[in-house]
From Swiss-Prot:
PROSITE patterns: RADICAL_SAM. Keywords: 4Fe-4S, Iron, Iron-sulfur, Metal-binding, S-adenosyl-L-methionine. Binds 1 [4Fe-4S] cluster. The cluster is coordinated with 3 cysteines and an exchangeable S-adenosyl-L-methionine. [4Fe-4S] cluster binds at C50, C54, C57. CDD domains: Radical_SAM. Pfam families: Radical_SAM. This is Uncharacterized protein MJ0804. SUPFAM superfamilies: Class II aaRS ABD-related, Radical SAM enzymes. Its cofactor is [4Fe-4S] cluster.
Amino acid sequence: MIVLRNEICDKLENIAKILKFVRHCIGCEGINLEIENPQHHPSIELTQKCNLNCIYCYSRLKTVKRGIYGNLEEAETVTISQYGEPLLDLEGVKKAIEFCKDLGLRVDLQTNGTLLNEEIIKELKDLGLDLIMISLSSFSREKYKLLTGKDYFNRVLNNIKIASKYLHTIVRSIYIPGFNDNELLNLAKELNNYADEIMVHQLISYKENENLLKNAGIDLNNLGRIRDLLLIVDEMQKNAPKINVTIKGCLLVQLKEMDGFILNNITYDVFSEVPDIKREHRPLPW
């Protein structure tokens, strides 16, 4: 008899089974396998400008118009935003929150966290913001500067701690195997008493930023293994037992259906074309 399973297969299968969906993904069609062509939450795009220069970012590689993408009338949640740093247009963020709350929607804000302060966080909460996602993929000033081009690590970490006092706070981290493994483990340990959740994403490489990644010392041959992603998330969860450490829901729902042997051998396609928003566009109503 040929045995294709081993101890690591059982471990991976168990990790996928016990991982919980991040709150941002609740209500998204992407976690419903019965929907043939699922759509993610609609988004409101305010600007493509950003005060960081992240080496893995796709935002500067594609032109996206300001406006609403997707059907708000059929949605439960809207995301502000998926391109650029929305807090560069703080007044636009405030108007977007008010507009969406009038429609009875949950509002999730995605930001790099550099422009936050306690006053802004409290004001956004008072306007009805439900959830904030702050990007942080390192646990040192040096690695942060290498990834983003700026020296804002301490500011962002402090703003995460402030935000968690007022809002459901999710830290979004990019996992780069062989590059920031220990950084993420230490970050999880630090956030155990602050953030509510950490959502770990695999690094996606685009042709346009491939050289930037290589110049930073990232080995592109290490990217994409589901095995590595599940194992790092499991170790991060051990370091942060008080909070939920997980992966994006539309991937997790698929992995939960897979055998451990498949999980141990499957590779995610991390070499991609720059994403484009192929959804209905409407201008902002304000």
